[in-house]
């Protein structure tokens, strides 16, 4: 297969990004479609593929960590395809004149490149690795934004910049414009236009908490004793402009072999999970800003479930973890990653950045995480890639940033409540039952506090982001927790751990840990490997 044919295949992908459906005033639905299926339906009548209903149906593509949504920006509208990311908060688009994309627009930098190789996933799905130079040419496929061609764009001259863990970089200024998808329109929507990009030919639609927005640097602004520029991002504007009732969304990736998943803004689909939907509080991540937490929860322990040996706990270390659909791999504390690797008699390979082991050991093994009285289990094969007779376990070691990516989330149903600062989780159901959607008006319908809701790691105010002291607080009632939350803003102004004490018998102990305060992005060489793999089914 020639490299150019792969890029042509990516071009054919875009023909299927047709937006169908209608809107409702209470919730918005984004079906998640996998890339292999898009190739198959490209020549079909789309009306036979998508079910039209009373909610917004926007095609979103799942490429193992890459979710793509079609957006129209400006007047007249310019079409872009943005990566949907639950781990960041800004909508960022690349400027049409950006040097990073413009220098490769003629394809001369990749036409003679054949730096790619075929590999395979554990399930036998073929995949392809392409050089980053070739991937950069995809700017034209994702689309760029020309602000000078939009009569409604206004630049507010507020600077932003951000560097991800793999070196991916954006820098530019914020502005406002009209954004639409199907018959949903957001007016005066704030987003960033990147004038300097490294390593990312696409834009991003971040849907995390606004506290994680790039802006001109939160810590920098506070150091200068000025209020940081924090704006209402995409989920917030959906509520502000009457599209949803609650700033919350549920994520369902569906099984590895399924055709569709979904993201529901402002609602929960009870048919997409089995068992109880349990709720956990988000952890305090940005201490210098008072009581605002980050989209991080507590993992109590990790176990391996094997049909032969049963339940085997590999670690009972508590750690803060982000459930991040924008990350393919999982990044766990080094001692936990080592314990998981050794449970398969694996040997760590620095070249593969993972544990190498005999593929026969996978079988029906599950990776199970205890989140505080309930467990979510994911098939270990989700974390495994294979080459010849060896398997690589893609559970990465980390000293500071802990994340469970989409290899784990594919087996979970997750509801992110950005107003109540809570995350609800259940085991995903793949029974293809009829939708049972319920609007989120206050708390998440059907969810109940986890047994370990009040025994969770929280951050000590005043600790630097990235490292810091955590305080294990055991609460006995919601009223106590409410008292605790009201004290956070005051406690944030001092380094006094006693400010966390509450009446009613709560207890606390302090342990030095690393937090998950930074966003980490998988390298684009692997993202492309995953991205292409679905085309080749």
Swiss-Prot record:
A lipid is attached at residue 515 (GPI-anchor amidated asparagine). Gene3D superfamilies: Acid Proteases. The keyword Lipoprotein applies. It is an enzyme of class 3 (hydrolase). The keyword Metal-binding does not apply. Its EC number is 3.4.23.-. GO terms for biological process: fungal-type cell wall organization; proteolysis. InterPro entries: Aspartic_peptidase_A1, Aspartic_peptidase_AS, PEPTIDASE_A1, Peptidase_aspartic_dom_sf, SAP-like. Keywords: Aspartyl protease, Cell membrane, Cleavage on pair of basic residues, Glycoprotein, GPI-anchor, Hydrolase, Lipoprotein, Membrane, Protease, Signal, Zymogen. Its main location: membrane. Residues 67-426 form the Peptidase A1 domain. Residues 25-52, 516-537 form a propeptide. This is Aspartic proteinase yapsin-6. It comes from Saccharomyces cerevisiae (strain ATCC 204508 / S288c) (Baker's yeast). The gene is YPS6.
